[in-house]
Amino acid sequence: MADRGCPLEAAPLPAEVLESLAELELELSEGDITQKGYEKKRAKLLARYIPLIQDVHTEAVQAALAKYKERKMPMPSKRRSALVHSSVETYTPPDTSSASEDEGSLRRPGRLTSTLLQSHSGIEPWLDRVIQGSSTSSSASSTSSHPGGRPAAAPSASTALAGLTAHAHIDLHSAPPDVTTGLVEHSSYERPQMASVRGIPRGHGRNVLETADGVPVNSRVSSKIQQLLNTLKRPKRPPLKEFFVDDFEELLEVQQPDPNQPKPEGDQMAVLKGEPLSVGTNGPLSLLAALQLWGTTQPKAPCLTALDTAGKATCTLTYGKLWSRSLKLAYTLLNKLTSKNEPLLNPGDRVALVFPNSDPVMFMVAFYGCLLAELVPVPIEVPLTRKDAGSQQVGFLLGSCGVTLALTTDACQKGLPKAPTGEVATFKGWPPLAWLVIDGKHLTRPPKDWYPLAQDTGSRTAYIEYKTSKEGSTVGVTVSHSSLLAQCQALTQACGYTEAETLTNVLDFKRDAGLWHGVLTSVMNRMHVITIPYALMKVNPLSWIQKVCSYKARAALVKSRDMHWSLLAQRGQRDVCLSSLRMLIVADGANPWSISSCDAFLNVFQSRGLRPEVICPCASSPEALTVAIRRPPDLGGPPPRKAVLSMNGLSYGVIRVDTEEKLSVLTVQDVGQVMPGASVCVVKVDGAPYLCKTDEIGEICVNSVATGTAYYGLLGITKNTFETVPVTADGVPVSDRPFTRTGLLGFIGPDNLVFVVGKLDGLMVVGVRRHNADDIVATALAVEPMKFVYRGRIAVFSVTVLHDDRIVLVAEQRPDASEEDSFQWMSRVLQAIDSIHQVGVYCLALVPANTLPKAPLGGIHISETKQRFLEGTLHPCNVLMCPHTCVTNLPKPRQKQPEVGPASMIVGNLVAGKRIAQASGRELAHLEDSDQARKFLFLADVLQWRAHTTPDHPLFLLLNAKGTVTSTATCIQLHKRAERVAAALMEKGRLDAGDHVALVYPPGVDLIAAFYGCLYCGCVPVTVRPPHPQNLGTTLPTVKMIVEVSKSACVLSTQAITRLLKSKEAAAAVDVRTWPTILDTDDIPKKKVASIFRPPSPDVLAYLDFSVSTTGILAGVKMSHAATSALCRSIKLQCELYPSRQIAICLDPYCGLGFALWCLCSVYSGHQSVLVPPLELESNVSLWLSAVSQYKARVTFCSYSVMEMCTKGLGAQTGALRMKGVNLSCVRTCMVVAEERPRISLTQSFSKLFKDLGLPARAVSTTFGCRVNVAICLQGTTGPDPTTVYVDMRALRHDRVRLVERGSPHSLPLMESGKILPGVKVIIAHTETKGPLGDSHLGEIWVSSPHNATGYYTVYGEETLHADHFSARLSFGDTQTIWARTGYLGFLRRTELTDASGERHDALYVVGSLDETLELRGMRYHPIDIETSVIRAHRSIAECAVFTWTNLLVVVVELDGLEQDALDLVALVTNVVLEEHYLVVGVVVIVDPGVIPINSRGEKQRMHLRDGFLADQLDPIYVAYNM
């Protein structure tokens, strides 16, 4: 036994302990103590003397974790409501599941005799008998590995108890460890930040947090970000370089191989041949011949015994019954399934077998019935719902096999989902099937002399076994009659099966070893098989051992998970005896981690008759069937061996023997010898099938009669797998016969024993190293196997992000796990995997118990889990992303090169034949001298003139939500109302000319009258948006700030708003005592002013325009009378506005072009403006479009928020609007007033949607203005349509414009921002050198125009930065012209189109605001580009905003869905930003819809959002800090 690696050495017990034990036995026998009390006391007595058995790998994990001290790492914040996840099922005894489809083979026993945890409250009663698995504490017992497999000396009971209490303390109170640093010791720890909870004071009872530099931080969020930054600053292990190449086209670097990586050095391996297959002369010649022989000569011999969930035998099928029932079924299939007098089935047709795991008898009848009828059985799993995990792929299998008939039992059919007609439902992706119930009463007895003509030899297909690949596709492996016979003969020879032996089978009898041994080979040898159903194993994991005893079974067929669970349940079972077993076949012996289950099982059961040589691991695959199996010595097997391999070597595909003291080693056992009659070789995993060297890991290939022959109906993939020709290094084929690839990775060891280290399906290639999913699962389970992960259910897979595999680990957490437990466990898993595998985990997700998709026998359906992860339907309850650690192939951060001087740039452009990027609108010179221009120099004069010449001409119509006109103003009415306001200002307000007056009005005619009233008395108006009555707390301070910053001497408003400004509610938000004079203009007396003020010069200030930029800066610009009239003149010319025109305006009238269109243009041009307040659309979305239709407006203006509201709100109502008579064919131009890059997707959606209402396709365009000039571009009624170009987004990040074709990768569409207005000149200047740039070069847009603002009145926030905005000069070229800098990046491009003047048209493309751009990794990003990608990532993302905080990218997404689905978004957001922008997201914040603040123009207020985030005011659903 010593060679098995984990001996249980008996320590001699002192006399007093023996005496106490004897007393205990007596008390128990006399009934003075319960069994439970006895076991507790006995365990306490023996605890010091029983050596701790712990598998090497668990120890390695503990040792690795012991090296990490607890360190601070920000814990994700979660809203309380998002914490509640009810598990589907309460906690039941351990399941047989784990990551792989072979359910749970990876679960390791851990420490088997530690009984200390039995007194722990909270461990379920059924667990009291169970030996607790390894702990994650770094107590003395878990840190040492034991060379040679000998256990360490047992620590004293007091030490062990101290270790336990320390463990409990650490688990419950310590901070989650830092995952990104090396093994640096940090002695202090701090309690992690718990999730933020609504309604509970945050930070209560906490110490004041400090940053790394000791600076106190008063924000919970800031402290977490600081922790994250500190974590990221620390050196990582191994050092992670940023690999790159300079070539712009191929930004991402393939990771360079490590020059010190191990390389294979051995000789080239030779093909290994198994012993010859000896076919006995006296045995049956085929499987059906055997069935007929035993069925007729030994009819009473038992063939198969089925058990129920209580472990009682429900049915024993004899060979006679099997033969007669199979014949009956064959006869029915061939003769009684007729449609239109033709047989429904022909020889060779495929038939699905749908039988539950609890009914082996009917399955066996069906299988042999099909073989007798020359039909091909295709066993599949019973579908539980219409949309089972992988159902579509099973449908693909059935379709590719041409299956039209399914056999099942009565009971099974009753349990299948039904359609409303009562028929069996159609399952997702399945072809139409006929269902045949094969219970006895449904079958027809054949005539006495009837016998099928079945030919069961040769290359014809016998049956098809399904196989699910890594990607989830299900294919059918064809097994021919000759392969089937050879497999039975090889297994008989290798396992030494003899007639009438008993075999206990725990495996699925429908496929794999369970089918080959328990259904096929058993019949060949007239064996008796006891089948243990899965449901019984769940209830009683010891049932198979009990059946081995009661039936004196000679062989048993199990998986390592079965051994593991029976170990946990074996206490108190005294009468178990396994001496009858000569072979215990471990079907998943190829799983590298099965060795620990085998060793632990032997340790416990050797004293109960189990001989070490009985344990026989084997290796198999669906394609090659059985590849190798260990034989007992009496069958000629060599002694078993194990190999301790360096994990690092394995990751490079190289075998390096190591010692067990090392942490990162993999101990594997042999899976025995090659099968009789087979040849085996190992070939390279990638590329051509070259033979491996003797110290190299490769894919095992088999040549044998006994393998599968093809993937049914799939010739393409068949050739690669079943017809491989291995070649030597010189390219010479090693054999004239093809080999079959097994999908197993391994090597041939000493004594020609086969060793398997993993499966190709579980291989993840990260960088240049390979990692096995099973290995990662095993490490994660060893962290705290029994404590945290629900039933050991862990899935590991890789996803491709940024051209490399990234490891994702998903685990089901116990229903009672707390947030802190979860985070603690995740942190430790990351450390353990980093230590042992030297690889980072990209994403670690925890889901509630019982929510991962299940494979047929309770394991996890990996491909379905991966699919859900990528689709965002996994619904985790905790997520930890570590992109900073894992993503090492980002492009090199941009190094700014010394800039070329402005003069050289001009010369360069001249040499290249490029013109300087300069453009202008129509000339205004010839208009300057005209009477009208002089007459219309002051708007107050224009209004008086109109009131005198056309007094009754209507200028304004205001609509309410119902579409009715609530107020109008003719020229004379507006003039008179303005006079009244002027009189009130002079008499009541006692204001002088030049005083500033704040106008706080809702959108309407009152605001316009107040504006002209101010002009009439020489005051300077400042329009201010009124506070929102329901949201005074945030809106009133802005009003107050503008009033104060603009130095307003008086506030004009309506009665209602005046009351609001002085109310108690207002007093809570601002100091109401410091308001200047507030005048209410609702009931002012009808008075005239003695004389209307006339400004002494056109350059005198006319009004102030205040606006808050998207970066949160409040800026007021000064508009002179000259600039005001120039603006109106320019718009009049561009839009061809005359008194006979009507235009519709749906804009906020408080600043920029919106204010000019609402208040100024109608008075100047005389056209009628239909005013639609945007707020009214909240109660009637169709108001604006109905107004446009009703008044037949040729020109209309709106904001993006209005357009979005119409697109979202009226999407399904276009038909209804058409019925109401809404017709938009009158519209020539519909302009979106904006200060940003045109939102093409929104304008296109709007155009497409309302095309049905007659909206011309060319009508929609955008305007462009900014603080220095509110109207630079505006499409107007003439000139070419706006053009769209496509630019390379990657070049844009480098401040370059690279034009590409539509649809090319990384292309970004940019639409021209309307036409440059008359009198406006635009040039593109370099942002730093201020030199002029060439055509199609990206730079800052500079503007010169008579309607430029004359300067900032004040900039609240960043005064110093803006001094030169209005008086910039070029550093080279035309250095005389005074320009205003817009602060926007863009470029000019001369198009092939012609203007009205006949000149070629210059298009201006706005890329984005310079203030908003994010400088990350030396590149310039525009937030909108990242946000567009994020919104596309998942249908539940309603809106998104990004900003930076100390070099971390923060992404805020609004969730339009269920709160419990919020965490799905974290990984998708991180993935998409990495893939499309090469950026690592630092923090993902998930919030409710409407949290991202948006201004009246529909622009996101990212800086307000940032302030709210840092002040912890967003009430997020979840905040994920990416490591």
Swiss-Prot record:
Membrane topology of this protein: Peripheral membrane protein
Membership in a protein family: Belongs to the DIP2 family.
Descriptive protein name: Disco-interacting protein 2 homolog A
GO cellular component: cell surface; dendritic spine; glutamatergic synapse; membrane; mitochondrion; plasma membrane; postsynapse
CDD domains to which the protein is assigned, alphabetical: Dip2 (cd05905)
Low complexity bias: start-end ranges: 134-158
Protein's GO biological process: acetyl-CoA biosynthetic process; dendritic spine morphogenesis; positive regulation of peptidyl-lysine acetylation; regulation of modification of postsynaptic actin cytoskeleton
Positions bearing Phosphothreonine: T92, T115
UniProt enzyme class: ligase
Taxonomic classification: Eukaryota, Metazoa, Chordata, Craniata, Vertebrata
Region ranges (Disordered): 72-110, 132-158
Gene responsible for this protein: Dip2a
Tissues expressed in: Detected in heart, liver, spleen, lung, kidney and brain with highest levels in brain (at protein level). In adult cortex, preferentially expressed in excitatory neurons. Broadly expressed in neuronal, reproductive and vascular tissues as well as in heart, kidney, liver and lung with expression detected in neurons, mesenchyme, endothelium, smooth muscle cells and cardiomyocytes. Expressed in ectoderm-derived tissues in the developing embryo. Expressed in the developing nervous system.
Originating organism: Mus musculus (Mouse)
Compositionally biased intervals (Polar residues): 87-99
Function in brief: Catalyzes the de novo synthesis of acetyl-CoA in vitro. Promotes acetylation of CTTN, possibly by providing the acetyl donor, ensuring correct dendritic spine morphology and synaptic transmission. Binds to follistatin-related protein FSTL1 and may act as a cell surface receptor for FSTL1, contributing to AKT activation and subsequent FSTL1-induced survival and function of endothelial cells and cardiac myocytes.
Principal subcellular localisation of the protein: membrane
